[in-house]
Amino acid sequence: MSTIVRQVTVQGRVQGVGYRAFVEYQAMKLDLEGWVRNRRDGSVEALFAGPAEAVAEIIARCRRGPSSARVTKLDEQPGSVDALDLRRPGERFSTLPTL
């Protein structure tokens, strides 16, 4: 099974509503590697690495988000394996500081 890496940027009401915690929880349930962080422009950015089916599923879940969020736009692009190095040592999935 090959690993794919995707980076997403999510816009809408996605900060201050538990969106990052939702993404981290969903990613861990799907056994994905990566990270999630807020951006100063009000969006949320995430990187996911894992089997194609699981990555597609997490992106679908990101489009929905938690009930308190309202996603208006999700941009997806290929990600870099090197970007996984941003995770905290020893963690498969990390919530990173705001960028």
Swiss-Prot record:
Top-level taxon of the source organism: Bacteria
Gene3D superfamilies per the UniProt record, alphabetical: 3.30.70.100
SUPFAM superfamilies: Acylphosphatase/BLUF domain-like
EC number: 3.6.1.7
Keywords attached to this entry: Hydrolase
InterPro entries with a match to the protein in the record: Acylphosphatase, Acylphosphatase-like_dom, Acylphosphatase-like_dom_sf, Acylphosphatase_CS
GO terms of molecular function: acylphosphatase activity
PROSITE patterns listed in its UniProt record: ACYLPHOSPHATASE_2, ACYLPHOSPHATASE_3
Protein name according to UniProt: Acylphosphatase
Organism this protein belongs to: Rhodopseudomonas palustris (strain BisB18)
High-level lineage: Bacteria, Pseudomonadati, Pseudomonadota, Alphaproteobacteria, Hyphomicrobiales
